[in-house]
């Protein structure tokens, strides 16, 4: 055989020491940061937690075996959990999309932040590690909804 040929080999990329969290959902899901997705060599959609239909496939390997999910890997959409009382005070309702300002040395504004309201929620914004690191935000910092 002459000419240039292409050989393809399976490449195993992994993120080790991943925490498994509850509560149990209707469908298994894995939330990764955009950086994790790049490391894994995957195209992962940004979705609201629980919205896994048509999302990226992923394997989960543990000490007692492995499972393969045909779909279920997402980058979680940034969101704020709040109680109905907090929502009323902020002038927002469940499902609203707002902007949030981190008024620190990075001066970051996060757009497309979904409001999630439930009696069981404590006021807290959820962003991934990429977003937190870029904006120099840590647990306990305060941000402002600017709508």
Predicted regions and their residues:
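Beta-strand/loop-dominated core regions that host nucleotide or nucleotide-derived cofactor-binding catalytic loops
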Residues: 16-84, 97-147
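Structural and coupling elements of P-loop NTPases
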Residues: 11-14
């Amino acid at each position: 055989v002459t000419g240039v040929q292409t050989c393809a080999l399976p490449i195993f990329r992994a993120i080790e020491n991943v925490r498994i969290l509850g509560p149990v959902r209707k469908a298994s899901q894995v939330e990764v940061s955009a950086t994790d997705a790049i490391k894994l060599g995957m195209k992962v959609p940004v979705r609201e937690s629980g919205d896994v239909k048509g999302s990226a496939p992923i394997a989960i390997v543990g000490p007692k075996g492995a499972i393969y999910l045909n779909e279920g890997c997402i980058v979680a959409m940034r969101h704020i959990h709040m109680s109905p009382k907090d929502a009323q005070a902020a002038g927002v309702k469940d499902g609203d999309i707002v902007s949030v300002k981190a008024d620190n040395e990075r001066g970051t504004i996060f757009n497309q932040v979904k409001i999630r309201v439930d009696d069981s929620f404590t006021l807290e914004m959820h962003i991934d590690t990429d977003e937190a690191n870029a904006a120099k935000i840590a647990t306990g910092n305060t941000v402002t909804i600017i709508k």
